[in-house]
Amino acid sequence: MVSICPTVTVQNRDEFDSQLALTASLTNRLHIDLSDNTLAPRSLLPITAMSWPKDKQIDLHVMVMQPGNILNELIRSKPQLVIVHAEAEGNLYELAKRFKINRIKVGVALLQPTPTSIVMPALDLIDHVLVFSGNLGYQGGSSVDMTLLSKVSELKYAKPSLEIGWDGGVNDQNIADLVRGGVDVINVGGYIQNASDPLQAYAKLKTAAGII
């Protein structure tokens, strides 16, 4: 079943509390962005300043060049999924091992220019691949690049059980195309957070995606 995950992308605790309260009122699975200005062009609220209700399923998108530097903090926060970048530095196998030991699923994000061949050798370790079509570190302002759906097809062919996420430019006019293209988890930021009625915006997305 397709999941629509509202995203939380903030630089301070007040924004975090506000966006978390909004997104948590919509669904149980949430996508939270982390950035230290090494991979994405700006810093976001650090993981050590975050907390969330224990009954929520949290996906952490780690836009950090050296994710190993915050490995212990990531594990202590107890998300259900941690997504590191294929473009980051460090040993993915070691990171994956530590996450798996702590019952955390392993995800890898691919920026637009990054081919799927980068992650193919590690698919046995990976639970989730995030196809990124947005502006790294920001909410809204991006458009969907439908040519990136070819990555979804390539990954699903290589590992049919792999969960595929999408991040960037999603709205009620294009979400159905992403669902038809094989995307399992659709992360949505600006369309929800910037809406005059976020609850109605989320409902429109569900209807357009065919989620009852």
Outline where the language-model segments fall.
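Conserved N-terminal beta1-alpha1 strand-loop-helix module at the mouth
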Residues: 1-81, 89-91, 98-100, 105-106, ...
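Generic beta-sheet signal
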Residues: 7, 61, 109, 132, ...
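Flexible, active-site-adjacent loop/turn segments at secondary-structure boundaries
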Residues: 37-38, 136, 168, 190
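Long, low-complexity, intrinsically disordered polar/charged segments
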Residues: 71-84, 152-156, 164
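Glycine-rich phosphate-binding active-site loops on the catalytic face of alpha/beta enzymes
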Residues: 86-90, 130-141, 181-202
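Active-site/ligand-binding-proximal alpha/beta "capping" segment
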Residues: 130-135, 142-185
